[in-house]
Amino acid sequence: MPVVECDIQTARAALADAGASFSDGNSEHELWHADLGDAHAVAYADKLVVQGGSPTDITAVVQPDRGGRVHAYFDGASRGNPGPAAVGWVLVSGDGGIVAEGGDTIGRATNNQAEYDALIAALEAAADFGFDDIELRGDSQLVEKQLTGAWDTNDPDLRRKRVRARELLTGFDDWSITHVPRATNERADALANEALDDA
C-alpha cells in the first residue's frame, strides 16, 4: 500500500482533473477519500495512503514525473523461525527522502521466507510508484546471493519466491542488490518488528 507524501491540495486538484470521485473522510484525521480507476486514496494532512488493485491509477496522477531510481530497503522478521513473521520495507528517493514505507504480518514463516516476502513487497511498492531503476538493500546475504544466482536456491518455497522476485525485476530498466549491515537497514527492521508487536 503506497504512502505518498505530497501537498494534499495539489494532489486533489490533479485527481479532480483526472476525473476522480471524492467523498468525505471517516475520521477527524482523514480529510477526504478519492477513487480513480481501480485505486482508492485516503488523504491526511501531508500524505495520501493509496489502496486497491492498481495503485498506479492514483500515484501516476499525483506523481507524474516519478520515474528515476529508488533505493529499496527491506527486512523480514520471524519469531521462532518458523513462527509469527512480518515484513518491513522503505523506498528512498535519490535525494534521500522517504517516498513510502510499510510493514505487515505474513503469518507463520521462517526468517528466510520473511526476507523474501519483504523483498517482494518492496519490489511491488516500487513498481506501483513507477520507478525505472531500483537499488535493493537488505541485511540477508542469502537473499542477495540467491537473487543474483551466486548461490543455488534449493528450498522449494524460497525458489518460488525467488522466481516471483525475478519476475518483478523484469519491470525495471536496471536493478542491483547490496547486502548491508543491520544498522543500515534499521528502519525496515523496525517496521517489521512493529508489525509483529501490533499483531
UniProtKB/Swiss-Prot annotation:
Source superkingdom: Archaea
Reported cofactor(s): Mn(2+); Mg(2+); Co(2+); Ni(2+)
GO molecular function terms noted in the UniProt entry: DNA binding; exonuclease activity; metal ion binding; RNA binding; RNA-DNA hybrid ribonuclease activity
Residue numbers binding Mg(2+) 1: D75, E115, D139
Chief location: cytoplasm
Reaction catalysed by this enzyme: Endonucleolytic cleavage to 5'-phosphomonoester
CDD domains: RNase_HI_like
Residues reported in the UniProt entry to bind Mn(2+) 2: D75, D189
Residues that bind Mn(2+) 1: D75, E115, D139
Cofactor note: Divalent cations; Mn(2+) and Mg(2+) are preferred over Co(2+) or Ni(2+). Divalent cations are required for folding and substrate-binding, while divalent cations and NaCl are required for maximal protein stability.
Keywords: Cytoplasm, DNA-binding, Endonuclease, Exonuclease, Hydrolase, Magnesium, Manganese, Metal-binding, Nuclease, RNA-binding
Region (Not required for RNase H activity): 1-68
Binding site for Mg(2+) 2: D75, D189
Known function: Nuclease that specifically degrades the RNA of RNA-DNA hybrids; seems to act exonucleolytically on RNA/DNA hybrids. Endonucleolytically removes RNA primers from the Okazaki fragments of lagging strand synthesis on its own. Complements the temperature-sensitive phenotype of an E.coli double rnhA/rnhB (RNase H) disruption mutant.
Entries under PANTHER family matching the protein: POLYNUCLEOTIDYL TRANSFERASE, RIBONUCLEASE H-LIKE SUPERFAMILY PROTEIN, RIBONUCLEASE HI
UniProt protein name: Ribonuclease HI
Organism: Halobacterium salinarum (strain ATCC 700922 / JCM 11081 / NRC-1) (Halobacterium halobium)
